[in-house]
């Protein structure tokens, strides 16, 4: 309400489109009490609804019982989709907020189209992070030690893989690639960590241009020897949050 919006949408998602989220990005359990996966929460000034898939129908019903949040069994007969709900519950001139960095463009565009049917609009604004941090201690970003695998383990150096990416950029008529998937960052740099359960990846981005490659990762996560190996392979280091500003520059 303070942001001048009628509602906000939260998804089980992060800026890397990860299947398993770092606790830092997993806001849905805190705001809804629902601890399942692959869910979407819409909170408006007049009501709330959470969509979960068939694995979590029973869990959702139990965890949301006694709250104002309606548990939507996604895919069941008679249950509206998120898009149908938005069209029905937003009127002309009203706004839905979401954190655009954590919602894929194709999905966000679908929400925008659904809102437009009733004259409402979508706006990318993160109101969840400041609210979360004002109410409790938000989990920190993962900070497990990172290490580089050897070329004997991976079959190619980071420099060779960067060259492969540049060849593909030329074919596509492009000049840069923002690498956001954690598995893709790991493949490109040969870097591994333990930031996610059962997944040997580090929370990081990479940006490949025709003359540079930058790894965006929290300072201190790589030891000096591995940082030098990356530098020798043409990879420079910048802090994790600096990707957007770097792209804009």
Region locations from a protein language model:
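Acidic beta-strand-to-loop metal/phosphate-binding motif
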Residues: 94-101
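N-terminal accessory/capping or targeting/presequence segment of soluble
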Residues: 1-90, 103, 107-248
């Amino acid at each position: 309400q303070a942001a001048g919006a009628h509602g906000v949408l939260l998804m089980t998602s992060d800026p890397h489109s990860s299947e398993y989220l770092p606790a830092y990005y997993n806001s849905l359990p805190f705001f809804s009490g629902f601890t399942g996966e692959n869910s979407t929460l819409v909170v408006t000034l007049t009501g709330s609804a959470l969509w979960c898939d068939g694995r979590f129908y029973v869990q959702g019903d139990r965890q949301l019982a006694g709250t104002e949040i309606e548990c939507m069994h996604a895919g069941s007969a008679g249950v509206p989709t998120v898009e149908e709900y938005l069209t029905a519950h937003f009127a002309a001139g009203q706004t839905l907020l979401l954190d655009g960095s954590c919602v894929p463009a194709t999905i966000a565009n679908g929400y925008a189209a659904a809102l437009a049917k009733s004259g409402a609009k979508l706006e990318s604004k993160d109101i969840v992070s400041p609210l979360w941090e004002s109410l409790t201690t938000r989990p920190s970003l993962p900070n497990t030690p990172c290490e580089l695998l050897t070329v004997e383990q991976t079959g190619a150096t980071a420099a060779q893989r960067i060259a492969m990416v540049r060849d593909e950029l030329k074919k596509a008529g492009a000049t840069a690639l923002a690498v956001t998937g954690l598995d893709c960052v790991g493949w490109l740099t040969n870097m591994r960590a333990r930031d996610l359960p059962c997944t040997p990846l580090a929370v990081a981005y990479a940006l490949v241009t025709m003359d540079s490659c930058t790894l965006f990762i929290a300072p201190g996560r790589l030891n000096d020897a591995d940082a030098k190996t990356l530098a020798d392979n043409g990879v420079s280091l910048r802090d994790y949050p600096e990707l957007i500003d770097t792209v804009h520059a």
